[in-house]
């Protein structure tokens, strides 16, 4: 087999790209990547012809987690991999975001980047290998691509940065940062952080950028040796002469007047009127009619960008640092455990919080063997009515999963520990109305919903998005605080930052250009800090200033007790008989951890206390003189057996039943009687002995 491989040392491990001419040879580009013992097969494939009737670049990125990579057989009936996991979807999105801007904007051929994880070394994260491998496979292919780009991950433990941390370090650190770069600029940022100060975050971003330059040089070397010549393609750009004719029919001033409104629906109606006018004018030109939608979009885009860049004039009339009108309210939904509504302009999110015992946390069956469950879940829904459209609901797509994960990541650093608050927590963000930055509105609504539910979060968290419009030079740019949908569509950047008053908890940066300069990155982070502090002070804190001291009226209550781990079996009983008996009698839920922590969850305080007392009785060493209440469960000639807790029985000898002599147990007791007994210790056979006559009967 003709085999060629190239290597580079990245931190502690060797990154190797195997370029086998007899592997994946029908793909346009293929790289078999190794980093330590982590192995990922990365391919880039493009269709031969452009797809007809579309006005976008059809890029698909797949990250496939094979369970054999960690020596597992998949669960489920079929015992094979099914739909992509949440982690696989999020990784696909992280790979997509830096690569998409580097493809030609007028390219309409379908492109698929496949990344198949074939083995996992816990010291070398497969997501990172897939990111770099996808870039290599695309760069060496004949697919038009203005690369290379490279990615690096940064963690932080005890204030020290760790480049490309292991799985364990990634989980334990205060920072999870992924940065993609081109030769000169940063093109993608994704971060979760434990209230990292802005200056520290910027330092980490540019440490990753430095490492990326080494990887880019490595990719350049690979392309020089095995890269293919990029193929020619049919441009789908709107002809310049069509634009000139459009301007004669609809002047730039008319277009500016159409888009200059703070109401999204009014603007859309204005554009429909313009489109109808142009459709009538071009009725004889079928070629132009076929691309009229794209042409109007481009005309509107140029108009908006000129307004912002040259005149500092936003479509809704705001100043470049101004946030849309804000409103917040809690307890808007009855009977739920917690709820909140957050509104920013024409973006509105209702969030509902639900609390449950830890047994209901999400189980995870993935490649990371250290991650088996998730206690906090945030789910984001985006129905079609929120943007005035009609579309059937097909369940959450990649966008919904990505937005949900971002708001989830934003709040994890401020959640109480399991010991402080032994609940599984789910928040659901329902998008009532959307005109940009719903993920940041979801973060604000989720935070208030948690506080309303009585979750003792450490600090309030808010989020905001910063946009960008660039000119011909790096110094010619305008940053926009709180972008609406139009500024997101026609702008160059969506820079989302969440955090507390102390620092950043999450970042997600999407761009449509070939990277950002350092002044833009620093300016966006500073702008987002000012905005989130303003949102907290003027909107969120007036609605709810601190977490409630108790969980909601309809939320389950939890009481806990620590028992000797050796007594767990006593509580569970044979085949679960004892614990199921406690649950059946009291209606509570019981969770037991391996270290002996027993959590009792319910809504009836009396029944919870009863279950707790049962657990205490079962796990306590019996002492002479202890008094119990129990039920007669068996009668013998020599005495009666009393069940004083599920699975626990003691015997009252016939001589200990009454103060006077009795001939038959049945003369005093019948099955099912509830009696009070005092413990006499254990008899010669190790059984618990009780007396009824030495304690008052009720």
Predicted regions and their residues:
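Flexible, glycine/charged-enriched surface loops at secondary-structure junctions
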Residues: 105-111, 146-148, 215-233, 265, ...
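Long, basic N-terminal domains or extensions that often function
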Residues: 1-234
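Glycine-rich, flexible beta-strand/loop modules in the N-terminal catalytic cores of phosphate-handling
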Residues: 27-112, 117-119, 124, 190, ...
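Long, charged amphipathic helices and adjacent flexible linkers at domain junctions
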Residues: 229-240, 534-561, 607-629
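Mobile "lid/hinge" segments at catalytic clefts and subdomain interfaces of large enzymes
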Residues: 142-262, 450-549
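Conserved phosphate/anionic-ligand binding catalytic regions in large, soluble enzymes, centered on
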Residues: 29-31, 124-143, 330-353, 435-455, ...
């Amino acid at each position: 087999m003709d085999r060629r491989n190239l290597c580079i040392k990245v931190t502690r491990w060797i990154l190797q790209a195997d370029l086998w001419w007899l592997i994946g040879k029908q793909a346009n580009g293929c790289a078999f990547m190794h980093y330590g013992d982590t192995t990922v097969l990365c391919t880039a494939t493009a269709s031969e012809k452009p797809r007809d009737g579309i006005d976008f670049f059809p890029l698909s990125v797949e990250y496939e987690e094979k369970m054999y990579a960690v020596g597992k057989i998949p669960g489920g009936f079929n015992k094979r991999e099914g739909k992509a996991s949440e982690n696989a979807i999020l990784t696909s999105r992280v790979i997509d975001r830096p690569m998409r801007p580097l493809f030609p904007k007028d390219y309409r051929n379908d492109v698929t980047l496949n990344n198949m994880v074939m083995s996992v070394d816990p010291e070398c994260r497969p997501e990172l290998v897939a990111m770099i491998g996808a870039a290599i496979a695309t760069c060496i292919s004949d697919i038009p691509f203005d690369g290379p780009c490279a990615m690096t991950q940064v963690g932080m433990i005890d204030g020290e940065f760790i480049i490309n941390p292991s799985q364990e370090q990634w989980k334990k650190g205060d920072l999870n940062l992924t940065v993609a770069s081109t030769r000169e600029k940063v093109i993608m940022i994704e971060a979760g952080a434990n209230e990292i100060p802005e200056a520290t975050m910027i330092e980490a971003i540019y440490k990753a950028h430095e490492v990326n330059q080494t990887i880019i040089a490595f990719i350049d070397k690979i392309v020089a040796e095995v890269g293919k010549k990029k193929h020619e393609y049919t441009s789908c750009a709107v002809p310049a002469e069509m634009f000139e004719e459009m301007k004669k029919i609809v002047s730039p001033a008319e277009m500016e007047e159409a888009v200059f409104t703070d109401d999204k629906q009014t603007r859309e109606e204005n554009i429909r009127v313009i489109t109808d006018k142009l459709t009538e004018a071009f009725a004889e030109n079928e070629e132009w009619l076929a691309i009229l939608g794209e042409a109007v979009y481009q005309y509107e885009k140029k108009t908006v960008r000129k307004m912002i860049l040259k005149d500092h004039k936003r479509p809704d009339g705001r100043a470049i640092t101004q946030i849309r009108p804000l409103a917040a309210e809690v307890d808007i939904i009855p009977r739920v455990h917690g709820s909140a509504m957050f509104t920013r302009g024409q973006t509105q999110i209702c969030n509902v919080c639900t609390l449950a015992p830890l047994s209901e946390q999400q189980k995870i069956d993935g490649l990371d063997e250290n991650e088996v469950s998730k206690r906090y879940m945030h789910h984001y829904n985006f129905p079609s009515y929120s943007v005035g459209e009609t579309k059937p609901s097909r369940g959450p797509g990649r966008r919904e999963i990505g937005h949900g994960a971002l708001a989830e990541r934003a709040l994890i650093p401020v959640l109480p520990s399991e010991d402080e608050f032994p609940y599984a927590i789910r928040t659901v963000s329902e998008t009532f109305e959307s005109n940009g930055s719903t993920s940041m509105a979801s973060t604000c609504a989720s935070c208030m919903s948690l506080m309303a539910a009585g979750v003792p979060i450490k600090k309030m968290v808010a989020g905001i998005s910063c946009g960008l419009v660039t000119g011909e030079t790096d110094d010619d740019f305008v940053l926009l605080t709180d972008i609406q949908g139009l500024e997101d569509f026609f702008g160059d950047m969506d820079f989302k930052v969440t955090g507390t008053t102390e620092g950043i908890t999450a970042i997600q940066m999407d761009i449509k250009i070939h990277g950002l300069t350092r002044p833009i990155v620093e300016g966006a982070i500073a702008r987002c800090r000012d905005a989130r502090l303003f949102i907290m002070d003027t909107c969120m804190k007036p609605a709810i200033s601190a977490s409630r001291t108790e969980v909601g009226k309809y939320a389950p209550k939890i009481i806990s007790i620590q028992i000797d781990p050796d007594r767990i079996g006593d509580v569970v009983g044979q085949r679960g008989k004892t614990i199921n008996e406690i649950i059946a009698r009291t209606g509570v839920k019981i969770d037991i951890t391996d270290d002996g922590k027993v959590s009792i969850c319910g809504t009836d305080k009396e029944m919870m206390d009863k279950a707790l007392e049962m657990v205490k009785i079962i796990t306590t060493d019996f002492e002479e003189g202890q008094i119990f209440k129990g039920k007669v469960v068996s009668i013998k000639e020599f005495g009666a057996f009393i069940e004083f807790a599920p699975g626990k029985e003691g015997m009252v000898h016939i001589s200990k039943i009454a103060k006077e002599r009795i001939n038959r147990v049945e003369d005093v007791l019948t099955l099912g009687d509830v009696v009070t007994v005092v413990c006499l210790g254990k008899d010669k056979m190790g059984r618990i002995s009780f007396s009824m006559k030495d304690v008052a009967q009720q």
